[in-house]
Amino acid sequence: MGCGMSTEEKEGKARNEEIENQLKRDRMQQRNEIKMLLLGAGESGKSTILKQMKLIHEGGYSRDERESFKEIIFSNTVQSMRVILEAMESLELPLEDQRMEYHVQTIFMQPAQIEGDVLPPEVGSAIEALWKDRGVQECFKRSREYQLNDSARYYFDNIARIAAPDYMPNDQDVLRSRVKTTGITETTFIIGDLTYRMFDVGGQRSERKKWIHCFENVTTILFLVAISEYDQLLFEDETVNRMQEALTLFDSICNSRWFIKTSIILFLNKIDRFKEKLPVSPMKNYFPDYEGGDDYAAACDYILNRFVSLNQHETKQIYTHFTCATDTTQIRFVMAAVNDIIIQENLRLCGLI
């Protein structure tokens, strides 16, 4: 009798091989797809990192895309000046030059959302004049006492260019623009052989409960903290320190049952603003156990340790970087290092190392 395989056995073997090959293809595809969850409290810099990824890996913004940021930039700029003028009333800080009152009325007459391709000339003139007023400058110095957009000074300093009839937003203008993220946004980038799927979720408190269980299979979590906000209060609850809120959120994510095997990359962000603030706003006023004075390195170490010490899992890796999300050169360097970490983590998760 022949010892050849029966038709049934051949079909069974072929099916097994096809299943094995499909599993292998799935593993390879999984290896080439990186799912990254961007987390952090509101205004920590998550959306800025996504914009940097576009600049670094997709060649930047087209003319049409830059055009689309004009209204956001105009609205951010006008709204920031309005916030300062309202704060001057509540803090009882007068204008140095009362002739500026005309410009104040111009600002208050503007809608919340500025529409159009050009900032009205009278609005540009009003912001330029008010920004030079000592009363406005004094109020700006006290911005930790109210809620002011981080980019206010940048836009005010550049108001002549922004208000020009032929204005076209540059990379920095776009990076510093601010729109509150609500819900979950997914952005995809191709980096080398890898496809990055980056999920950005709303940072404000009301957004958080919606998403946590949806992402237990992510490759890694990129968690951002605005360390410059150590002396500021939450937008949603002006009794809670922003840094304390970030620590609470990091604790809940780092030790969540959904993310036990997930590595975390921690960006301690806005180091430029942090460095400026330390000499004028003592950290000890907000964190009494801090003993480093206005020494930048000591303050960085203190904050780093406060976050890393929350990790309750010995096997969980936390990779840390001090960052300035608006600095494209620095973010390009940091993201290259992050890419190496993520590749290793992904190979581990796929069972390939």
UniProtKB/Swiss-Prot annotation:
Binding annotation for GTP: E43, S44, G45, K46, S47, T48, D150, L175, T181, G203, N269, K270, D272, A325
Residues covalently joined to lipid (S-palmitoyl cysteine): C3
Bias type Basic and acidic residues, positions: 7-26
Region spans: G3 motif: 196-205
PROSITE patterns for the chain: G_ALPHA (PS51882)
Stretches assigned to the G-alpha domain: 32-353
Protein name in the entry: Guanine nucleotide-binding protein subunit alpha
Provenance organism: Cryphonectria parasitica (Chestnut blight fungus)
